Amino acid sequence: MDSLRKMLISVAMLGAGAGVGYALLVIVTPGERRKQEMLKEMPLQDPRSREEAARTQQLLLATLQEAATTQENVAWRKNWMVGGEGGAGGRSP
């Protein structure tokens, strides 16, 4: 009988803890309107940020394409955005 009582108390405590956790989750979760506002404030939502990210992606792709077509080690360049001699004096190690 004592073990049944302990088991019921344990189940009740676990249930109460789960209930409190769920209640806290409901309280701190933003509503639908707040979710929409947060989505609008995200970094890549404005056109300028999207254009900058697209330009960065284009530069990266161009650098990778150039690295694939040349024997020069582009990692030695001081400025990856331009061609020419790098930190190794134009020679590949």
Swiss-Prot record:
It is a single-pass membrane protein. Pfam families: UQCC3. Keywords: ATP synthesis, Disease variant, Membrane, Mitochondrion, Mitochondrion inner membrane, Primary mitochondrial disease, Transmembrane, Transmembrane helix. Residues 29-93 are mitochondrial intermembrane. Its main location: mitochondrion. The chain crosses the membrane at residues 8-28. One of its GO terms (molecular function) is cardiolipin binding. GO terms for cellular component: cytosol; mitochondrial inner membrane; mitochondrion; nucleoplasm. Residues 1-7 are mitochondrial matrix. It is found in: Mitochondrion inner membrane. Required for the assembly of the ubiquinol-cytochrome c reductase complex (mitochondrial respiratory chain complex III or cytochrome b-c1 complex), mediating cytochrome b recruitment and probably stabilization within the complex. Thereby, plays an important role in ATP production by mitochondria. Cardiolipin-binding protein, it may also control the cardiolipin composition of mitochondria membranes and their morphology. PANTHER family: UBIQUINOL-CYTOCHROME-C REDUCTASE COMPLEX ASSEMBLY FACTOR 3. This is Ubiquinol-cytochrome-c reductase complex assembly factor 3. It comes from Homo sapiens.
